[in-house]
Amino acid sequence: SLGATYEGRQTGTFGDIAAISFNGNKIITGSCGGALLTNSKKAADRVRKWSTQAREDAAWYQHEELGYNYRMSNVVAGVVRGQLPYLEEHMAQKRAIYERYREGLRGLPVTMNPYEAAKAEPNFWLSCLLIDEKAMCPQERGDLEARYEGQSGKSCPTEIIEALARYNAEARPIWKPMHLQPFFRDKAFISAGPGEDVGADIFRRGLCLPSDNKLTADRQERIMEIVRACFA
């Protein structure tokens, strides 16, 4: 959420510690790595030590606790610093993509990722949609594969993903919840109470649309034509 604000505050300023990713698909990218934000010198010093394999201040390699090799290379850091002045420009490009989707998909039984404009200003990093329940065609997902049964006037994330892939455009489901991952399925977790599993429902009906800031209006219109055709 780099660049996004909530009630006038940058999202990275909430809490004692915040983390920012510079992965290859982020709004500012170094292809990998990230940053930790804190006003605590104690926390910052601790993390710096851990990131250099927890090496002690000695002439030899001295390790008294477990550390990690999480240092960012100078090359990656330079790439990130070189992009930072363009953050506002990237956000404007992302917002234009979001607004074109919202206008171009108007009339379909979908909802674009919402935000509370009176309180929040997103960075519009990723444009997503949620298909109305009544407009979902049958869809089944295993751990690695998915299938669907097409129905007139209805669609599902799997159908749209496959249709866009034929145009060489990548779309993906919204993130699979941690408690549904095979590694965690047999682990205990705390829920908000009985009722609908909101995360699982969003994963089932949600879709991340192509959102690269270099996406042209013409190509985006073709993507929207494909999405509209899935609901025909």
What do these predicted regions represent?
Residues 2, 29, 215:
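Hydrophobic/aromatic residue at the end of a short beta strand that borders the catalytic acidic motif
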Residues 1-21:
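Conserved PLP phosphate-binding loop immediately N-terminal to the Schiff-base lysine helix
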Residues 14-15, 32, 127:
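Acidic, glycine-centered active-site loop in nucleotide-sugar glycosyltransferases
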Residues 27, 31-35:
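Glycine-rich phosphate-binding loop of ATP-grasp-fold ATP-dependent ligases
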Residues 11-12, 28, 69:
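Alpha-helix termination/capping residues and helix-transition junctions
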Residues 5, 41-232:
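PLP-dependent aminotransferase class I/II
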Residues 20-21, 34-40, 81:
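Short beta-strand-to-turn element immediately C-terminal to the catalytic PLP-Schiff-base lysine
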